[in-house]
Amino acid sequence: QSSSVLSDNGRYRIPNDNPFVSTAGARKEVWALGLRNPHRLTWADGHLIANSIGLHTWETVNIIQKGANYGYSLREGNEALQFDNHITALPEADRIPVQVTDTVTAGTVVPTYPVIQYPHKPGGGDAVGTGLVYRGSMIPALRDKYVFTDISTGHIWYADFKEMLAADDGNPRTMATMHEVKIRWKGQVYDTMFPIVESAYHARGGKRARLPGLALVSGEGRADTHVATDASGELYVLTKSDGVIRVVSRPR
């Protein structure tokens, strides 16, 4: 099954300009469809961004467009997803059915592809977390960059937001470049939040040998890492596995 992004107005009614209002049998509240698990949404400069957790292969960041079909369950990332859940190259005729209901289709459409993706492999992760465009002043190098996380591994990355918008060009191979955020904590520099969270988990009374939760890439539990900002646009890192909210301060 796939997920959709819905649109209603302030009175919980369906806007007249929703894309499927006039499509017979369609759910009129749907704004965009074909995402597996778009569990994190954020707005930036009038653009809606959805971080969607993948099945076995790709985690994705998507620019949500009116009426767009992001392909799931026939696409994952910029590849074709087969019925046995194996990934293959895209077909030359890259079109998929428009599924109006479980049994009714209405023609075909070219899928819309992500602007960022990363694999379920070391250096990537298991589940894309929160993301936001940083507007604060504490970290100039991140200003106007899209900062996002992987939940389980504790990776924090950024991408140039303008590059993300440019990557939404209809070419499935066009992706914005991901850059790793290094974390300085107590005099040491880390590639991910995972060792920081693991240390705090035990210091705060955690009883397990490893962090709780299942994570296939790390094999060692979940850091459960997310980002947020305050009213001034400054960045915070939230890690549920150790129950800590950390303020990101100016580099020293």
Residue ranges and their predicted role:
Residues Q1-V217, R222, P251:
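Beta-propeller domain segments
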Residues T225-R252:
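Blade-level signature of beta-propeller repeat domains, shared across WD40, Kelch, NHL, RCC1
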